[in-house]
Regions:
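Structural motif corresponding to alpha-helix initiation and N-cap regions
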Residues: 107-108, 194, 229-230, 298, ...
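Pocket-lining segment of extracytoplasmic ligand-binding domains
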Residues: 212-214, 223-302
Length: 364
C-alpha cells in the first residue's frame, strides 16, 4: 500500500536547503509535545533522504531523525544510545543520523515534516496518529484499554502494523509504522489518595480535550472539566479543578507537587511512541539497509523501554522528596476502574473503533 512517488525535487530542495518547518516547543495537554528539525544535508539524492542506489549496502545514507522531546529527555538519550549510536557504529559511519530534538515545533509540525520528506524517521504516539489520520484506531491510546507493554505489542502486531490496519492508512499518507517503545504511565494527581472509582466521584478532573478520554472518565464518575494546559497549575491552585492526570515527568516538570498532594499510579493509559518512517525514504533504501535499520529499531525499543521505566522509578522517588504522597500501583484497584469504564469502552468500540473492545482485551 505504498503511496505513489511524489515529485523528487521538492524533497531534495527542502533537505538540502534546511528549510525549517517551524521552531518552538511547548507542553501539549497530552504529555508534552515539542519538535524536531529541518536538518541540512547534501546527500545528492534526487528521490530520498537516503543516498542509496544499490542493494549491497555500500552507499552512504544520511538520515534526519526527529523527536518532539528535548535532548535531555530520557527517551531521546535512550534513542541516541540504542538506535543512533548502534546504526553509526555498525556501518562505520556509512549511515549517519542527524538528530533533531525539539527544534521543529509541535506534533503537527513534525508529522508535516515526515509527510513532506524533510524528516526520515520520527517518534510519535498512537494518539497523535489517530487524531490526525484515523480516529477509529484511537483505542490504542484511550484510557483503561491497554494493560502493559506486552499487551500493547500484541495489539500493535494484530491491529496497527498490518497493512489492513492503521499502517495501511498511514502508508496512504506516505508514512510507515514501525515498532513501539514505552514512554510512561499516565496516572492521577489530586489532594487525596485515589485507589478505586469511588475516590473520583464528582472530582473536577482536567483532561486533554479528547472525546474518547472524556467518555471513559465521565462513565467512571469524574466531573470532566476543560482547562487549557497552560492554565492547569493555576486551575489546581484556585480550585477550578480538583485533579489532573498525566505522567510523573509532567507532574514534576510543571511543579504540580506545589498544588497537589497525591500522585496515584492508576496506570490508566500506557503512553507509547512508534518509530515512523517516511515511505519514500524507506523505499529508497537497499534491502540490507532496510533490514539493518528495522532490526536495530526492534532491538532499540527494548533497551529504550527499560531505560525509561528505570527513570520513571527515579521520578517517583523525586516526587516523594518534594513532599508528594505517591500511591503505588499495587494499592490501586485498576480492575475496578476498568469495570466502571467498561460501558463507555463498549459504546466506543461499537460506534467509533475499528475493532471491538473484547478483541483488544483478549490480547492481554
Amino acid at each position: 500500500m505504498a503511496r505513489d512517488s511524489k515529485p523528487t525535487t521538492r524533497r531534495s530542495v527542502l533537505k538540502k536547503g534546511g528549510i525549517a518547518v517551524g521552531i518552538g516547543m511547548g507542553l501539549a495537554g497530552c504529555s508534552g509535545n515539542s519538535g524536531g528539525g529541518g536538518a541540512e544535508t547534501d546527500s545528492g539524492s534526487t528521490n530520498s533522504g537516503a543516498t542509496t542506489s544499490a542493494d549491497n549496502g555500500s552507499e552512504e545514507v544520511d538520515i534526519t531523525f526527529a523527536t518532539t522531546q528535548p535532548p535531555e529527555n530520557v527517551s531521546v538519550q535512550a534513542a541516541q544510545e540504542h538506535f543512533i549510536d548502534v546504526i553509526e557504529e555498525e556501518t562505520g559511519g556509512r549511515i549517519s543520523v542527524s538528530l533533531e530534538a525539539a527544534t521543529l515545533g509541535g506534533t503537527e509540525d513534525n508529522l508535516d515534516a515526515l509527510e513532506a520528506g524533510t524528516v526520515d524517521i520520527l517518534h510519535e504516539s498512537p494518539t497523535a496518529l489517530s487524531q490526525r489520520f484515523a480516529s477509529e484506531y484511537s483505542f490504542a491510546g484511550d484510557p483503561f484499554v491497554i494493560e502493559d507493554m506486552e499487551h500493547y505489542s500484541a495489539v500493535n502486531e494484530e491491529y496497527l502494523k498490518p497493512e489492513d490496519g492503521l499502517n495501511g492508512i498511514l502508508l496512504d499518507n506516505g508514512i510507515r509504522l514501525g515498532d513501539a517503545f514505552y514512554v510512561g504511565n499516565r496516572s492521577f494527581t489530586s489532594n487525596t489518595s485515589v485507589t478505586s472509582p469511588e475516590d473520583v466521584q464528582g472530582l473536577k478532573l482536567r483532561l486533554p480535550q479528547y472525546d474518547t478520554w472524556t467518555s471513559v472518565w465521565d462513565e467512571i464518575g469524574a466531573d470532566v472539566t476543560p482547562v487549557a494546559y497552560d492554565e492547569l497549575y493555576s486551575a489546581l491552585q484556585t480550585g477550578v479543578v480538583d485533579a489532573s492526570e498525566g505522567p510523573i515527568s509532567q507532574f514534576l516538570a510543571v511543579s504540580l507537587y506545589e498544588v497537589q498532594t497525591h500522585f496515584s499510579v492508576t496506570s490508566h493509559l500506557l503512553d507509547t511512541k512508534h518509530f515512523l518512517y517516511n515511505e519514500e525514504f524507506y523505499q529508497g533504501l537497499s534491502d540490507s539497509d532496510v533490514e539493518l535499520i528495522t532490526s536495530t529499531a526492534a532491538d532499540a525499543v527494548q533497551g529504550m523501554t527499560e531505560d525509561i521505566k528505570s527513570r520513571e522509578e527515579e521520578l517517583y522517588a523525586q516526587a516523594e522528596e518534594e513532599g508528594t504522597t505517591v500511591v503505588p500501583a499495587e494499592d490501586v484497584d485498576r480492575a475496578a476502574f476498568v469495570e466502571a469504564g467498561q460501558p463507555a469502552l463498549e459504546e466506543l468500540s461499537e460506534s467509533k473503533w475499528a475493532v471491538s473492545i473484547s478483541d483488544v482485551q483478549d490480547l492481554a
